[in-house]
Each structure stands twice: as C-alpha cells, then as structure tokens.
C-alpha cells in the first residue's frame, strides 16, 4: 500500500514498410522539449510517452493507453507512420543518417542535442535506437539504505530475471552489420536470432558499453554511490579526450571528455 508508480515508454516511428521514419517530430504532438507526456529520446524518430505518478496500477496503464492511442491516431492521420513495438530496432539506415533529437535553439535545448551527439560518437547511433520501458516507483517510508539493499538484491538476481522475462530474442541484420556475431538466420526470413536467447538487448550485442564496464560503482550506500559517479563525471577519459569537445569546424562533438557527460549517461 502507498506505492506510487509511473511509466516512460520509448518507441521508434516507422514507415509502413518497416524502415525508420526520418521525418521531424510531428508538430501535432507538441514540443518535444516542453510537452509533459510526449517527448523524444535519443533520436528525432524515437518517441517517449510519459505518465504521471499513480497510486493504482490500472490508472497508470489507462493513462499510458490514452497517450499511446492519441499518438497512434496522430501518426496515422499525418502520414501513415506507425510505432515499432519491439525493443530492438526496425530496419535502420547508415549510422550517421539516424537523426538526432532536436530541441530548438535555447541553451537547454542545444545542450540536450549536443549530449546526444556525444552518445553517438561514443557508442554509435544504432545502439541508441534500442527502446524500452522505464518503470518508476517509490515506496512510502523507505530509507536510502533500504533502497540500496533492494538495488543490490536486484543486481544479484538480474540474470535470472532476464532469463525468465527477457523478450528480445531476435533482431534486424542491419543492427549488427559489420560486427562479429554468432546469430543465426531465421527460416523463411531475414531476422537474426539465437535459439535459446531471451534478451539480446541486454547481451554483448545490445545496450552495452565497454568503457562504462570499467566503472567501479558502489551500491553500498548513497555517499559511496555519489562519490563513484562523481569521479566518472569529472575525470577525463583518454578516448573521449582524443575525440575533443569541438570538431575542427567549431561544432560540438560532446558536452565533456569525462567517462560520463551527465548523470543520465550511466
């Protein structure tokens, strides 16, 4: 009793043919910078639908359904685009063709776009098109120490949860183009899969970072957690220093040269 929860659901806008829609964020969906319920994630083609905080599960799902239906009808009426249902992305163009989300010319809008430019340089734009659901929740009367105990337990059993509930066993060949993989081609189609895979999204081909794997983040308490992230946010990382903050033309490559540009990158 007393639990409050909210959902953030990401999804790619796609053409009826299954390819990524390269059109700007639809005007009919409002401003991606300021709309409280509908925004974009990494790409201009990647919608993020947001609910408020709810005490009841059904109320939360009902709001998400209403927002989802509004977006679906808006896309249908303004060009016939669809929302891709899977976590692993649809057919993608070349990496540099995937459009970054745009938020206008204000300082905060430009910072958000530069941050995404940095993500593209660091991890590749294709990886950033992986979509998912963020389930946000809070318990009444729970201390920071108790939250960290819960985090440690979740991380301890995460492999079992992915095995039981993972739902990304296949992907489009374009996602791993030019990369070494051991995936098999599905009979009668072009999709790649592994027979007993449950979550390619969370495997080595999915949403992973070798650079962040070097982070020694402490989950023993708030102070240790904050200190370990502070170092990642302030200490220069050689590979990102070599990339530089600006390119020769003066445009920004990234927000900074540390392992994490901002906290959200972790």
Task: For every predicted segment, state its role.
Residues 1-120, 127-129, 146-152, 156-162, ...:
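Terminal catalytic/cofactor-binding subdomain
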Residues 101-106, 110-122, 138-266:
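Loop-rich catalytic cores of soluble enzymes, especially ATP-dependent carboxylate-amine ligases
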């Amino acid at each position: 009793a007393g639990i409050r929860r909210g959902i953030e659901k990401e999804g790619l806008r796609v053409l009826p043919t299954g390819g990524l829609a390269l059109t700007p964020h639809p005007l009919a969906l409002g401003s991606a910078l300021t709309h409280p319920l509908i925004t974009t994630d990494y790409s201009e083609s990647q919608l993020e639908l947001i609910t408020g905080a709810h005490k009841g599960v059904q109320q939360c799902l009902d709001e998400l359904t209403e927002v989802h239906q509004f977006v679906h009808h808006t896309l249908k009426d303004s060009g016939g685009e669809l929302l891709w249902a899977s976590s692993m992305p649809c057919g993608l163009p070349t990496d540099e063709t995937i459009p970054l989300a745009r938020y206008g010319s204000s300082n905060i809008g430009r910072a958000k776009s530069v941050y995404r430019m940095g993500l593209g340089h660091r991890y590749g734009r294709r990886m950033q098109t992986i979509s998912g659901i963020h389930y946000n929740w809070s318990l009444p009367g729970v201390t920071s120490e108790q939250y960290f105990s819960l985090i440690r337990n979740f991380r301890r059993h995460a492999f079992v949860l992915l095995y039981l509930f993972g739902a990304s066993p296949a992907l489009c060949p374009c996602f791993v183009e030019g990369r070494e993989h051991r995936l098999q081609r599905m009979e009668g189609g072009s999709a790649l899969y592994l027979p007993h895979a449950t979550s390619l999204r969370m495997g080595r081909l999915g949403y992973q970072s070798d650079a962040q794997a070097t982070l020694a983040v402490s989950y023993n308490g708030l102070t240790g957690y904050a200190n370990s992230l502070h170092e990642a946010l302030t200490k220069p990382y050689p590979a990102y220093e070599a990339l530089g903050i600006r390119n020769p033309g003066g445009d920004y490559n990234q927000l900074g040269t540390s392992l994490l540009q901002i906290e959200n990158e972790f």
